Amino acid sequence: MLDMSEARSQPPCSPSGTASSMSHVEDSDSDAPPSPAGSEGLGRAGVAVGGARGDPAEAADERFPACIRDAVSQVLKGYDWSLVPMPVRGGGGGALKAKPHVKRPMNAFMVWAQAARRKLADQYPHLHNAELSKTLGKLWRLLSESEKRPFVEEAERLRVQHKKDHPDYKYQPRRRKSAKAGHSDSDSGAELGPHPGGGAVYKAEAGLGDGHHHGDHTGQTHGPPTPPTTPKTELQQAGAKPELKLEGRRPVDSGRQNIDFSNVDISELSSEVMGTMDAFDVHEFDQYLPLGGPAPPEPGQAYGGAYFHAGASPVWAHKSAPSASASPTETGPPRPHIKTEQPSPGHYGDQPRGSPDYGSCSGQSSATPAAPAGPFAGSQGDYGDLQASSYYGAYPGYAPGLYQYPCFHSPRRPYASPLLNGLALPPAHSPTSHWDQPVYTTLTRP
């Protein structure tokens, strides 16, 4: 009977006897059904829980109806919260993370900023926190030493107290992720490091082809079929055009010291040679290329001499298609010679050493591949054509015998250089000290 009277004296579903909760329950009586019989124990439990809470918690609880709050209290009443594992900040566990985080002691500015921030935030609640921090920093820099002294003393006191509280404290700064990101960027940059060098070689190949376009055959391509590359920069073009005007002179201090790989047959070179090619000096090869007087044929000419330039249409001879057109009395339109291991001597005329005939190499087309026109008569005029068409003058700084290119040889050297007995040709970058003398056959006029 006493329990029933207590239940009647309290509003139904009320967790506490406060006026606010009573008024709330009275308002919500219409939509919240009264608790069934036997809920007096729930009401008492709600009173105990509600009395233990502070006012803010009660205000937050008013969002829910009284019956919901009673049910939650009933469920949570017998639960032992010490069994719940506390979450560790920062993810991965471990002995270090299990310890509670100890903050560093505040320095003088932090003491000032903390006290001033509280005061200013109370006075100017609309101030943004970042703007407040900027202003506090400016004010701190304007303070004199005497004005800073109380904050410095407080910071020192806090430091001493911190040392007493945590005698074995060591500051362990958190590792920033940005450092790892920068490290990975540098790794990727190291992986990409070798590629710009290869691109530079590629650009040089395209650029030297552009240099030869300034001759007779504007708009026609010289060189192997390569994929399109980035065009040369203006600086490189400006450096290439004055070289076209220098006909026979060698520029001693040329802007570019590395070898231009445009006309070197890269398939002939091994990977080790290509790897160390940048260290070579252009003028190192000059000892093998004497300028004056008759000279023995060079290994590069044995390669380059097999090419043939017919009229105004440049032809790149492919290695994969060997030619059998070696008859000395061939007539009709000229056919290009294909580069083989031993160039056929049949297409070259009976020339004295040192005075080659450039008839087949000049800009004009001739009826036969090499029609002998006397020792000096035809060669001088054709050499003038060569100079005018800038085949020889395009890159005078480089040794002509080293580059396999149509009509890219010095006029003082024989154009034909077959070797005896089909000897294996040494590579162009490592000439040996002794050569077999070339054999010249007589080509009779048909």
Swiss-Prot record:
It holds the Pfam family Sox_N. It comes from the Eukaryota. GO terms for molecular function: DNA binding; DNA-binding transcription factor activity, RNA polymerase II-specific; DNA-binding transcription factor binding; RNA polymerase II cis-regulatory region sequence-specific DNA binding; sequence-specific double-stranded DNA binding. The keyword DNA-binding applies. Residues 224-298 are annotated as: Transactivation domain (TAM). Residues 362-378 have a biased composition (Low complexity). Residues 40-53 have a biased composition (Gly residues). It is found in: Nucleus. InterPro entries: HMG_box_dom (IPR009071), HMG_box_dom_sf (IPR036910), Sox_N (IPR022151), SOX_TF (IPR050917). Residues 155-171, 210-219, 242-253 have a biased composition (Basic and acidic residues). Keywords: DNA-binding, Nucleus, Transcription, Transcription regulation. Residues 430-446 have a biased composition (Polar residues). SMART domains: HMG. One of its GO terms (cellular component) is chromatin. A motif (9aaTAD) lies at residues 400-408. One of its GO terms (biological process) is metanephric nephron tubule formation. Residues 102-170 bind DNA. Its main location: nucleus. Residues 58-100 are annotated as: Dimerization (DIM). The keyword Transcription regulation applies. Residues 335-446 are annotated as: Transactivation domain (TAC). PROSITE patterns: HMG_BOX_2. Residues 1-58, 155-259, 318-378, 425-446 are annotated as: Disordered. The transactivation domains TAM and TAC (for transactivation domain in the middle and at the C-terminus, respectively) are required to contact transcriptional coactivators and basal transcriptional machinery components and thereby induce gene transactivation. Transcription factor that may play a role in central nervous system, limb and facial development. May be involved in male sex determination. Binds the consensus motif 5'-[AT][AT]CAA[AT]G-3'. This is Transcription factor SOX-8. It comes from Homo sapiens (Human).
